[in-house]
Amino acid sequence: QPYVELGARARAADNENATSGLLYSIANRVSYVCGFTGPSLAVDTACSSSLTALHLACQSLHTGESDLALVGGVNLTMGETKSHFLAKNNFLSSDARCRSFGADGTGYVPGEGVATLVLQPLAAAQAEGRNIYGQILGSAINHGGKTNGYTVPNPKAQSALIQRALDKAGCAANRIDYVEAHGTGTELGDPIEINALTETFRGSGSSCAIGSVKSNIGHLEATAGLAGIIKVVMQM
């Protein structure tokens, strides 16, 4: 059964261990066991959760609040309630196949997974002889604001966000040759994402490939962003 239900029942029974099943305990249990004393928080921004956590971790490193950060995500399907909801609202692929940016895409396929990245300032990582698999030059987060629907993305906001991340990274659009996209395989979301990318890269004078790990392992929802980063690092 979903842990949220177990937690609710335990609290109702006045069980002192009820806190172990709440969202915040995911991060704070790690800090407790490992003896970490820096910021410890669980982030819930739906499908962008793990990337939002990554952004917040970068900020903590930039300000000197932390000298090393663990950014993790986990997505497990513990019951059938979510599947019923997604099917009822036509979110799911009709044949259980995720076709990111495919003309015959009919919806997304939920996936399960766990992902973790270790972040550290570059100079410190080099001084300590760490294995460095990638470098984050810039990150940004925003919200789509008012759109045609609560779950409908805003291409203008997406384009502005991409441009802001490029600006923070000091990187021109024509230097980008691959984008790991959200690419859920939905008829609504994929075209909007393509429009946002087109707006950002129009006039750059170069071509840019796009892809999404969701066609390989499904949509890891809260963990999807980290899964995409790990894919890119592994294919470099």
Predicted regions and their residues:
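Condensing-enzyme catalytic core of the thiolase-fold
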Residues: 1-236
